[in-house]
């Protein structure tokens, strides 16, 4: 932590706080060293608190079943999403807090979930509202009521391919768009 405080814009105290979140996520020392660079780069680029950024990254990586060494890639995805949508890293982190456990369990990619959250942010649905809404939609489609299933069948909406494997999130969105696109208000 002291070395990072001396060689980056973050203080040793900031670095220690970030590492505390990593430790709470169960990261070992090697994991912390693998992950800290991506987390610091994201926090610096987004002008966000290092501890908060570490919490966002560690929680999301855990939910998606990713490794500490994936933190740089995840940071890049979040930075791109926040740069291309009406949101920021902190709000995306709030969204991920709610949707990541469900999306990760359904094997959806960080990229697809970030894209969906960015689109929602552009429609003024942000932070915990976006995360909760997306989580609820995914959970409902994964285990629909009989009435929901009847409507999904009627409009050709499915989360799975013919062989039972999950469709990608992008395929689900395209499926929703084509199935519901002709409906009027």
Predicted regions and their residues:
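Conserved catalytic-loop aspartate of Hanks-type protein kinases
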Residues: 134
């Amino acid at each position: 932590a002291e070395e990072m405080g001396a060689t980056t814009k973050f203080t040793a105290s900031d670095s220690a706080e970030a590492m505390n979140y990593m430790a709470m996520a169960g990261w070992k020392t090697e994991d912390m060293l693998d992950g800290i660079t991506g987390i610091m780069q994201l926090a610096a680029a987004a002008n966000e608190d290092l501890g908060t950024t570490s919490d966002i990254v560690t929680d999301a990586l855990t939910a998606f079943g990713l490794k500490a060494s994936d933190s740089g890639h995840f940071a890049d995805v979040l930075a791109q999403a926040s740069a291309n949508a009406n949101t920021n890293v902190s709000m995306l982190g709030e969204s991920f807090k709610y949707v990541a456990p469900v999306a990760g369990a359904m094997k959806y990619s960080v990229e697809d979930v970030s894209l969906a959250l960015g689109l929602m942010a552009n429609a003024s649905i942000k932070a915990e509202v976006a995360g909760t809404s997306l989580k609820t939609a995914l959970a409902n489609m994964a285990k629909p009521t009989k009435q929901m299933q009847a409507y999904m069948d009627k409009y050709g909406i499915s989360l799975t391919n013919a062989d039972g494997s999950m469709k990608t999130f992008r395929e689900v969105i395209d499926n929703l768009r084509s199935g519901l696109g002709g409906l009027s208000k």
